[in-house]
Amino acid sequence: MAAAGVTAGAWRYWPEQGFWNPCRARLPRRLASHELVARAWEGLDSTQVWDCHAHLIGTGDSGSGIVLNAHMDSWLSPVQYARRLFFLNAGCAHEAHEGVDRVYVERMHNLIDGMRPGFKLVLYAFERAHDERGMPDPEHSDVYVPDAYAERVAKADPQYFEWVASIHPYRADAVHALERAKRGGARGVKWLPSAMNIDPASARCDSFYRALSRLDLPLISHAGLERAVLGRGAHDYGNPLRLRRALDAGVRVVIAHCASMGEDRDLDKGPNGPYVESFALFARLMREPSYERLLFGDTAGMTQLNRAGPALSRVIEEEAWHSRLLNGSDYPLPA
């Protein structure tokens, strides 16, 4: 009886199309012509509509430099292996026996062609985890997507893509790499602190923050619980309050997903402060007048089952925040 109850309760969360992405060429007509879709585009200049949070994934089979952790290709690590399959299926590259990098990019072309003219995706590079000495830690890096590859893909199809760099601030060449990314047209820098082993509140980030401010590049940093990419698993580094150091240095900060999942310590009440919802800490930062022109959030993934809820309702209802929210999908995760 208990098992039946659990099954019945879970059924309401079962996706209509199942858990495997059917990889349709375009949005079905009944959805593309739906009244809500038409209203969403109403009054918008589609050339100004970007998906500001999209991940560039592959296997490195094109010479891209992408590296997947060996555990993601081994049945001996079933969770990691399944994660790889889900990511590739989400990007419709799961059946590509060769040319996975190419097929993944072609799928994004296909999806953009189904949008309004001028729409773009902002593609993210993804840095390795690094140790405290600033050296790469491949054993604890789930995926590595080089800046050079993200730049190359974006520049090959500028009508489709922009790109964002990913640079670990502990690297000896971090500022130099940031300056190089700026010259290459990067629109910002992406961090996933818990996976990459970055403490945003560390003084080791100060020179990087000064460079970000000088170059007028935003920092897009994940905050709150992370489940898709584990890496070093340093969850405390995803606390939204740890980004105060960047904000106080004059850096524009985009808190990815509006920190809409998980709990973190309330560091404003001391290092051993109580755990509260990560989103509540994001909301606190958004209320601070000194951060009004510096702090933003993105909506990436917030409509997904694991995030949809009170946080999504709040960002919709909080009209004062709307001019500080960036549109994002967290592609390919929605697929």
Give short role names for the model-derived ranges.
Residues 1-5:
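N-terminal export leaders
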Residues 9-124, 130-141:
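An N-terminally biased module of ancient metal coordination in phosphate/nucleic-acid-related enzymes
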Residues 18, 26-32, 261-335:
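H/E-rich (His + Asp/Glu) clusters that bind or coordinate divalent metals
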Residues 26, 32, 120, 125-236:
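Active-site gating/metal-coordination segments in enzymes
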Residues 50-54, 121-123, 162-165, 189-191, ...:
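Hydrophobic faces of well-ordered beta-strands that scaffold small-molecule active sites
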Residues 53-57, 168, 194-195, 224-226, ...:
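Catalytic metal-binding/acid-base residues of hydrolase active sites
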Residues 111-119, 150-161, 248-252, 285-295:
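A structural motif corresponding to the C-terminal end of an alpha-helix
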Residues 172-182, 200-206, 231-245, 264-288, ...:
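Distinct, well-ordered alpha-helical segments
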